[in-house]
Amino acid sequence: MSEVSCKKRDDYLEWPEYFMAVAFLSAQRSKDPNSQVGACIVNSENKIVGIGYNGMPNGCSDDVLPWRRTAENKLDTKYPYVCHAELNAIMNKNSTDVKGCSMYVALFPCNECAKLIIQAGIKEVIFMSDKYHDSDEATAARLLFNMAGVTFRKFIPKCSKIVIDFDSINSRPSQKLQ
């Protein structure tokens, strides 16, 4: 007698890849033409409790405020205005408490975000890129994390790309007989 296979798929996303992919997908919401960063906060039960991306504050027009990186006057740059992904993920949390949670983030946090992460009680930061490693902000963030006991580590992906194919839901699974 033949039966339809009931063996699970082997090519599913493991939790770390899933959470980092959610951070990267969230980053696609950013309107910043130069830097798209996303963050995903996860609790000990592998439940997402917060997602954020870099953008202007709620109620402030991202069509009016500047997106440039440099200008003669700092007020003509994005830096005094933009909210980082980490801030937005903490503020957008769907849980009353993120204490003890982990944060997956595309870019290693700056010192200002490190302070927010520490104050929120997040205990682990997993980042993809540390391209500003030698900056004063990243150095201060590492110092703060070390002092507060927040662990941080670089994410090592098992694959370099994850493809989202909206048409795949319409295909019928092949029926393999044993």
Swiss-Prot record:
Modification Phosphoserine, positions: 174
Biological process per Gene Ontology, one example term: nucleoside salvage
Cellular component, GO, one term: cytoplasm
Family matches, as Gene3D superfamilies: Cytidine Deaminase, domain 2 (3.40.140.10)
Cofactor or coenzyme needed: Zn(2+)
PROSITE patterns (UniProt xref): CYT_DCMP_DEAMINASES_1 (PS00903), CYT_DCMP_DEAMINASES_2 (PS51747)
Chain ranges of the CMP/dCMP-type deaminase domain: 14-145
Key words, A-Z: Allosteric enzyme, Hydrolase, Metal-binding, Nucleotide biosynthesis, Phosphoprotein, Zinc
Catalytic reactions of this protein: dCMP + H2O + H(+) = dUMP + NH4(+); 5-hydroxymethyl-dCMP + H2O + H(+) = 5-hydroxymethyl-dUMP + NH4(+)
Regulation: Allosteric enzyme whose activity is greatly influenced by the end products of its metabolic pathway, dCTP and dTTP.
Its EC number(s): 3.5.4.12
Residues holding Zn(2+): 84, 110, 113
Active-site residues (renumbered): 86
Subunit details: Homohexamer.
Family: Belongs to the cytidine and deoxycytidylate deaminase family.
Name this polypeptide is given: Deoxycytidylate deaminase
Species name: Homo sapiens (Human)
